[in-house]
Design a protein with these regions (language model features):
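Short, conserved glycine- and acidic-residue-centered signature motifs
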Residues: 33-37
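N-terminal intrinsically disordered, cationic/polar leader segments
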Residues: 1-32, 42, 46-113
């Protein structure tokens, strides 16, 4: 089961995405559900990296992409917060579709921090 979490920390203005686990819908390397979730994480990571390179983040983002474990944390500048939030929101929409269509493989947790 892949567990996805998206949340914001108002105390420091950071936006978070984590993916943990495996879909286990097919053998390693053939699992399209896992590949879909992974692609969403890589897309957010790249978008956040571009934002950093363009001076839109307060500090370097935390990007950790490992097998079965992805963490992405961005702390955007105040003027760029909406752009960053939209980036994470689009990925959350994708994970929502996966969780809706494959509830036995993907779980989306809504957190309030």
């Amino acid at each position: 089961m892949i567990t996805a979490r998206f949340y914001q920390k108002p105390s420091n203005g950071s936006i978070h995405m984590t993916l943990k686990g495996h879909a286990k819908a097919a053998p390693y390397g053939e699992d399209l559900i896992c590949a879909s979730a992974t692609m969403l994480a890589y897309t957010v990571a790249q978008a956040v990296q571009f934002m950093y390179e363009n001076g839109k983040l307060k500090k370097k983002p935390k990007i950790s992409l490992r097998e079965g474990d992805a963490t992405i944390v961005a702390t955007p500048n105040e003027d760029d917060y909406a752009e960053a939030l939209h980036t994470f929101w689009v990925a959350q929409c994708g994970i929502h579709v996966l969780a809706h269509n494959y509830p036995q493989n993907v779980k989306l947790e809504h957190l309030t921090v």
